[in-house]
């Protein structure tokens, strides 16, 4: 890697958190931890059985807050990159955990929401949420109190902060996708957007994604190994450029 990059955009999917013990959605059978997606990740599922949906996310939240779930070397490397790069690093994540924050990243866009927040469906106001959400927990920020729900973007709902995402992609000179399947849009199209704006594109995954042909460079292996390796290459290129300019 020869060029020093100034505006790095990272897209992360379930693969980066899987190595930390967070189970992923299995697209081949439509199940998430043995639950049908239609039951636990749609507005209709929440309307049908709010108790079951709330408990599903309560269990995920408890696990995330347990000592068993920790950021892995890939999260830590991205935190280091943001701290040491002489430029900007934007992490766009499809994950709902807080492992990027705990790994040291600060400029994070949670396009699918956050497990450690709850949202009022009437006002869209969000609050920090580390305790269980129960059926009957009402929001009192609006005139008509509504049942609080997990701050999660369910299937059929619009991803969050799309304007900020596209603005970052327009500025990117390096776009890296880590642990994504490439089948969920609009995220699967980000590599095309970044490439059209001139960014170098890299895919890091266990196996080729559905959009692997869009990437100029592919690195296949564990995120915990490949991401730290890439970060060191980026920072080394920056150091060489600084030395040559001195």
From Swiss-Prot:
Its main location: cytoplasm. 2 residues (Tyr-57 and Arg-60) present in a large hydrophobic pocket are probably involved in substrate specificity. They are important for desuccinylation activity, but dispensable for deacetylation activity. Transmembrane segments: none annotated. PANTHER family: NAD-DEPENDENT PROTEIN DEACYLASE (PTHR11085:SF4), NAD-DEPENDENT PROTEIN DEACYLASE SIRTUIN-5, MITOCHONDRIAL-RELATED (PTHR11085). NAD-dependent lysine deacetylase and desuccinylase that specifically removes acetyl and succinyl groups on target proteins. Modulates the activities of several proteins which are inactive in their acylated form. It comes from Vibrio cholerae serotype O1 (strain ATCC 39315 / El Tor Inaba N16961). Coiled coil: none annotated. Zn(2+) binds at residues 120, 139. It is found in: Cytoplasm. InterPro entries: DHS-like_NAD/FAD-binding_dom, NAD-dep_sirtuin_deacylases, Sirtuin, Sirtuin_cat_small_dom_sf, Sirtuin_class_III, Ssirtuin_cat_dom. CDD domains: SIRT5_Af1_CobB. Residues 1-237 form the Deacetylase sirtuin-type domain. The lineage of its organism: Bacteria, Pseudomonadati, Pseudomonadota, Gammaproteobacteria, Vibrionales. The gene is cobB. It is an enzyme of class 2 (transferase). GO terms for molecular function: histone deacetylase activity, NAD-dependent; NAD+ binding; protein-malonyllysine demalonylase activity; protein-succinyllysine desuccinylase activity; zinc ion binding. Pfam families: SIR2. This is NAD-dependent protein deacylase. It comes from the Bacteria. Binds 1 zinc ion per subunit. NAD(+) binds at residues 13-32, 94-97, 179-181, 205-207, 223.
């Amino acid at each position: 890697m020869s060029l020093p990059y100034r505006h790095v955009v990272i897209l992360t999917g379930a693969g980066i958190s899987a190595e930390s013990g967070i189970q992923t959605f299995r697209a081949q059978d439509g199940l998430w931890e043995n639950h049908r997606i239609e039951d636990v990740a749609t507005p209709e599922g929440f309307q049908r059985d709010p108790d079951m949906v709330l408990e599903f996310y309560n269990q995920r939240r408890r696990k995330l807050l347990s000592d068993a779930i920790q950021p892995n070397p890939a999260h830590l490397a991205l935190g280091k990159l943001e701290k040491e790069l002489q430029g900007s690093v934007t992490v766009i994540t499809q994950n709902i955990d807080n492992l990027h924050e705990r790994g040291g990243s600060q400029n994070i866009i949670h396009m699918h929401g956050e497990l450690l927040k709850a949202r009022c469906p009437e006002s869209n106001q969000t609050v920090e949420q580390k305790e269980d959400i129960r059926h009957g927990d009402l929001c009192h920020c609006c005139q008509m109190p509504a049942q609080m729900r997990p701050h999660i973007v369910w299937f059929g709902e619009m991803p969050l902060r799309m304007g900020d995402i596209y603005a970052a992609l327009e500025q990117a000179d390096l776009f890296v996708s880590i642990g994504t399947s490439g089948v969920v849009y609009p995220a699967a199209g980000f590599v095309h957007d970044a490439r059209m704006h001139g960014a170098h594109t890299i895919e890091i995954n266990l196996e080729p994604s559905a959009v692997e042909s869009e990437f100029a460079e592919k690195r296949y292996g564990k995120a915990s190994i490949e991401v730290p390796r890439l970060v060191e290459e980026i920072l080394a290129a920056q150091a060489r450029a600084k030395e040559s300019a001195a």
